[in-house]
Amino acid sequence: MSTNPKPAFRRILLKLSGEALMGEEGFGIDPKVLDRMAQEVKELVELGIQVGVVIGGGNLFRGEGLAKAGMNRVVGDHMGMLATVMNGLAMRDALHRAYVNARLMSAIPLKGVCDDYNWAEAISLLKSGRVVIFAAGTGNPFCTTDSAACLRGIEIEAEVVLKGTKVDGVYSADPMKDPDAVKHDVLSYNEVLERELKVMDLAAFTLARDHNMPILVFNMNKPGALRRVIMGEEEGTYIKNLN
């Protein structure tokens, strides 16, 4: 039983990697994983949490390999942005099937497919209890979806960016390779930078730090972990200003 029955956060930005949607598949979207994630988001909405979502596109397209093979980086990034729109459409559909009101906003205009990103409208929708999915990254090449998550989190005045990954927090080393890797429960922004811990790319991380936006890294593949994070239970790694 939770020692903290009230949610720890009122408005969140949930960042999901595209890879998280693959499940056990090597590519694309696993429908079972998609539906489970939609159900977990539904639980938050039922708790009265305002939820914004940013999804990566790595399950459908990775631009780095093609860029190394000679493709123009801007073209590759545009393709990656469109991959995030495809994931966003899938998530919106899964939420609608779970009877959750959701809107998809894209940083690139896609008339007839989804809404254009509008900051004021997004906040209004969140206040009305709708889940808002932000697609197409920031709309600019050379910016990761982690940067988009931090940017949108700051814009919608979220209390935290929740980064759902394949591991249950931030470790001193890669836990997949180093059996002696130690998990951190709480870190300051400076500790992450000084120890060169892999949380997200530097541009995204410094954006969060400069705007005092806490980041909580947790394992989205672990059933119930998202709810535990929201309820303030010990789950994942919490990165914030400790001064």
UniProtKB/Swiss-Prot annotation:
GO terms for biological process: 'de novo' CTP biosynthetic process; UDP biosynthetic process. The keyword ATP-binding applies. Its EC number is 2.7.4.22. GO terms for molecular function: ATP binding; UMP kinase activity. One of its GO terms (cellular component) is cytosol. SUPFAM superfamilies: Carbamate kinase-like (SSF53633). UMP binds at residues 57, 77, 138-145. InterPro entries: AceGlu_kinase-like_sf, Asp/Glu/Uridylate_kinase, Uridylate_kinase, Uridylate_kinase_bac. CDD domains: AAK_UMPK-PyrH-Ec. The keyword Kinase applies. It is found in: Cytoplasm. Keywords: Allosteric enzyme, ATP-binding, Cytoplasm, Kinase, Nucleotide-binding, Pyrimidine biosynthesis, Transferase. Its main location: cytoplasm. It catalyses: UMP + ATP = UDP + ADP. Pathway: Pyrimidine metabolism; CTP biosynthesis via de novo pathway; UDP from UMP (UMPK route): step 1/1. NCBIfam families: pyrH_bact (TIGR02075). Homohexamer. This is Uridylate kinase. It comes from Shewanella denitrificans (strain OS217 / ATCC BAA-1090 / DSM 15013).
